């Protein structure tokens, strides 16, 4: 029995039965791959335009030829359709859409929601309760902002585990950057007021804050509270001094400047951000394009996708007019619940900002293209050295990091011909092995990564680099063999006798060793991938180790709750001091009797507890 081919998609018939309401349409290929997401003022007219026989460019014709089905979602307005369209593009990355890809997470300033809030740099999901201010163009801008926060408002930055267990103020208090809420040297109401002022500042309301502080200073003077008035005076002076040093243009206020540069199918959108008149710096983005979009289309796609995720400022300057600008303004204003303006062809100081962004976009794109060309050359050299017939599309590398067997973490980094693919990096917390057994750790990590790929028919690398010699390579080979994974070339990266860069030996599955030499571009590519795997593993290990060392297991001991735990840690200055104490010393802590002291000592030293002995 032969398979009956699926009938060709009848686009005209599909469009004819659609309504003229606004909405979003989606196009799918035979393997159910999403080809394209689009919005429409009138669905019937827009969808029908693809199938009316009029001339279209090669990209559109190629897309239409692959369609096997379509579906639509009706919306209440075209602005709502625009928002939905870009949410789908952002989450699904259709093949033929311009898509904003950025592997990096956006840094924010986090002001936590707790009795004594802390202020900190934050990346990643917003899992911690609190207020998030940003995004900022880069980490440097966040750190500069945090530096100001500590100088002006003296908010704590320490982790809760440190905060709860301090018995005296830290260095930050001594240098005037924290008010020491850990030991309550500041009243709760006074600290809460500092938090409120910091939030005003981060919202870009420093002028309002300065006026408010002036009124409070006047009131304190009239009430003869001269010390309070002096503190407020100093704070106002610091605020004004900061404004004088950092404000570029008071009229800039909250403002983003966007410029686009294109060369062939490569595009760079550069964001220059101002908040409360301060220049926060630039950040480049490299959207995925199909090579036939205009710079105006790329910029319009960026605006809609970026500001769906992040709150737009009141004013956005563009280096050119973009399609559907009025619709974008309506959608962004509705989303932000306030007026948002898109402007181009501006004059004066703002024209200078646009020119600056445009020049930086062009320079950044040129630098990126040079980097990608060099990366492609290295990737081609790797293919030639390994004797592969096809281009190397995906390389993965595993590394193991621990401290004497403690907090073992494995990393897996991913590179393609253009460089690192950070969104696909993975870390594995290793458990259930003998501490310090790197072979077992490597085997567990390989098994976990590729077992999931087998079960979910995931993507496999062309080349799998293992940081280690023949022993580590054998573990990876065994793990892949157990899972039935084939078609992946394994290469061990062994340090030379002198353990110097450029002297590495590449261990092949058949036991051969290749020594390309430091000048070989293929080895340079391997070193780049290996070093990134090492960096990613060691940062994960340090984080896990720090968390383990800061988190006491005292509460797992019967009879120890949060209050007794706090008393013990405060009395001994931390877990290290407690572990060094004998049973008699532990029993001197308030609330700890001899039996409980014996149980604590036994648990901390891995001995049989008195209860277990009985």
UniProtKB/Swiss-Prot annotation:
GO cellular component: cytoplasm; excinuclease repair complex
Listed CDD domains: GIY-YIG_UvrC_Cho
Residue intervals of the UVR domain: 207-242
Gene3D superfamilies documented for this protein: 5' to 3' exonuclease, C-terminal subdomain (1.10.150.20), GIY-YIG endonuclease (3.40.1440.10), UVR domain (4.10.860.10), UvrC, RNAse H endonuclease domain (3.30.420.340)
Ranges of residues in domain GIY-YIG: 20-98
Subcellular location: Cytoplasm
InterPro entries, sorted: GIY-YIG_endonuc, GIY-YIG_endonuc_sf, GIY-YIG_UvrC_Cho, Hlx-hairpin-Hlx_DNA-bd_motif, RuvA_2-like, UVR_dom, UVR_dom_sf, UvrABC_protein_C
Keywords assigned: Cytoplasm, DNA damage, DNA excision, DNA repair, Excision nuclease, SOS response
The organism's place on the tree of life at top rank: Bacteria
GO biological process: nucleotide-excision repair; SOS response
MF (Gene Ontology): DNA binding; excinuclease ABC activity
HAMAP family found in the cross-reference section: UvrC
Complexes and interactors: Interacts with UvrB in an incision complex.
Biological function: The UvrABC repair system catalyzes the recognition and processing of DNA lesions. UvrC both incises the 5' and 3' sides of the lesion. The N-terminal half is responsible for the 3' incision and the C-terminal half is responsible for the 5' incision.
Family: Belongs to the UvrC family.
The name this protein goes by in its record: UvrABC system protein C
């Amino acid at each position: 029995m032969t398979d009956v081919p699926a009938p060709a998609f009848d686009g005209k018939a599909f469009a004819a039965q659609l309504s003229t309401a606004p909405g979003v349409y989606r196009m799918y290929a035979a393997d159910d791959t999403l080809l394209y997401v689009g919005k429409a003022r009138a669905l019937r007219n827009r969808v029908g335009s693809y199938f009316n026989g009029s001339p279209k460019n090669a990209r559109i014709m190629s897309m239409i030829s692959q369609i096997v089905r379509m579906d639509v979602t009706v919306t209440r307005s075209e602005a709502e359709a625009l928002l939905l369209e870009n949410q789908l593009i952002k989450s699904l990355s259709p093949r033929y859409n311009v898509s904003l890809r950025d592997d990096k997470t956006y840094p924010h300033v986090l002001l936590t929601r707790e009795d004594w809030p802390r202020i900190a740099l934050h990346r990643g999901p917003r899992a911690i309760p609190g207020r998030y201010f940003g995004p900022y163009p880069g980490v440097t801008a966040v750190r500069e902002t945090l530096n100001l926060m500590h100088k002006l408002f003296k908010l704590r930055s320490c982790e809760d585990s440190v905060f709860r267990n301090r018995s005296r103020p830290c260095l930050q208090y001594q240098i005037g950057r924290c008010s020491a809420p850990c030991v309550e040297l500041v009243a709760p109401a006074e600290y809460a007021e500092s938090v409120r002022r910091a939030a005003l500042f981060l919202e870009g309301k420093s002028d309002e804050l300065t006026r408010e502080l002036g009124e409070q200073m006047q009131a304190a003077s009239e009430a003869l509270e001269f010390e309070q008035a002096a503190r407020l005076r100093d704070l106002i002076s610091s605020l004004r001094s900061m404004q004088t040093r950092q404000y570029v243009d008071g009229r800039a206020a909250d403002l983003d400047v966007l410029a686009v540069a294109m060369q062939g199918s490569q595009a760079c959108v550069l964001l220059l951000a101002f908040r409360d008149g301060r220049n926060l710096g630039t950040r480049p983005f490299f959207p995925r394009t199909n090579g036939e979009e205009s710079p105006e289309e790329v910029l319009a796609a960026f605006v809609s996708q970026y500001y769906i995720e992040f709150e737009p400022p009141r004013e956005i300057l563009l280096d050119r007019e973009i399609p559907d600008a009025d619709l974008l303004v309506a959608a962004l204003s509705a989303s932000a619940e306030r007026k948002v303006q898109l402007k181009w062809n501006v004059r004066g100081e703002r024209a200078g900002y646009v020119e600056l962004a445009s020049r930086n976009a062009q320079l950044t794109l040129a630098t990126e293209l040079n980097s990608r060309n060099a990366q492609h050359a290295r990737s081609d050299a790797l293919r030639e050295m390994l004797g592969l017939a096809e281009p190397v599309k995906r390389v993965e590398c595993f590394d193991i990091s621990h401290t004497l067997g403690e907090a073992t973490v494995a990393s897996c980094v991913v590179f393609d011909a253009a460089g690192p693919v950070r969104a696909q990096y993975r870390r594995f917390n290793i458990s259930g092995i003998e501490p310090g057994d790197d072979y077992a750790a490597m085997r567990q990590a390989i098994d976990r990564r590729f077992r999931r790929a087998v079960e979910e028919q995931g993507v496999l690398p062309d080349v799998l680099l293992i940081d280690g010699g023949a022993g580590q390579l054998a573990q990876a080979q065994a793990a892949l063999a157990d899972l039935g994974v084939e078609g992946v070339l394994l290469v061990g990266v062994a340090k030379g006798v002198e353990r110097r860069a450029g002297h590495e030996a590449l261990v092949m599955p058949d036991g051969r060793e290749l020594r390309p030499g430091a000048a070989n571009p293929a080895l340079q590519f391997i070193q780049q991938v290996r070093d990134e795997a090492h960096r990613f593993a060691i940062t994960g290990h340090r984080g896990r180790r720090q968390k383990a060392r800061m988190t006491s297991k005292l509460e797992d001991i019967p009879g120890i709750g949060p209050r007794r735990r706090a008393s013990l840690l405060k009395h001994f200055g931390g877990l290290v001091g407690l572990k060094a104490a004998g049973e008699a010393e532990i029993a001197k802590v308030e609330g700890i009797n001899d039996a409980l002291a014996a149980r604590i000592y036994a648990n901390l030293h891995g001995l049989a507890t008195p209860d277990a002995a009985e």
